[in-house]
Amino acid sequence: MKRFFLSLVVLCIATLASAQLPTDSLAEKIIIIPHIAITSDIPEPAQNLMMDRMKRILLKNGIVDTSDRSRFVLTVKSNIINEEWTETVPPKYVMTVEFTFYIGDVESGILYADKLFRRKVASDSPEKAYMQAVNAIRVSDPEFKIMIDKAKQRIVETLDAREEKLIIEGNEYDI
């Protein structure tokens, strides 16, 4: 009987102690998923490679989820700035591509952070050159961490502001 009460007391103390631990911050709970739009200007062969890069970027920063549903997304837009064939033998295709990565809220349309990367590559064909440009994106680039941290901070600020607004509106209707 003593063991039973002792076990019960220990269990109660453990439960109370765990209830006093600080909860994770909202920023640590934010889930961002990679997304490439159907209307993307990224050539089809490079889309899978780009999706893999974006997943690895998010995974490296600890916020990727395997689900396809999230309010917050990392997406990319690409622009070919310059392209030309060299007059060498064999001829090479040279292109400069800008990749702009965005983190935003698909529900509200708010953009939280963006980052531009420019890559210049040369290859035998335009398709291979584009693939090289995507391959040149380093997932360990510290600029990605800065962009993601900035987005998380802005997301938390936005959600906190909305919460305060709801509380104020709710207090107006108190009886």
Q: Which residues are covered by each model-predicted region?
A:
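Solvent-exposed, polar/charged alpha-helical surfaces in well-ordered, non-transmembrane soluble domains
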Residues: 48, 52-56, 131, 135
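Residue-level preference for beta-strand/loop junctions
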Residues: 5, 93-95, 164
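Amphipathic beta-strand/beta-sheet edge segments enriched in Tyr/Trp
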Residues: 74-127
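Sec/Tat-exported extracytoplasmic proteins
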Residues: 54-62, 105-107, 137, 141, ...
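Sec-dependent N-terminal signal peptides
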Residues: 4-16
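C-terminal/domain-edge helix-coil "capping" segments
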Residues: 111-175
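Short beta-strand->alpha-helix linker/helix-N-cap micro-motif
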Residues: 33-37, 56, 60-77
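A structural "domain/chain start" motif
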Residues: 18-52, 150-175
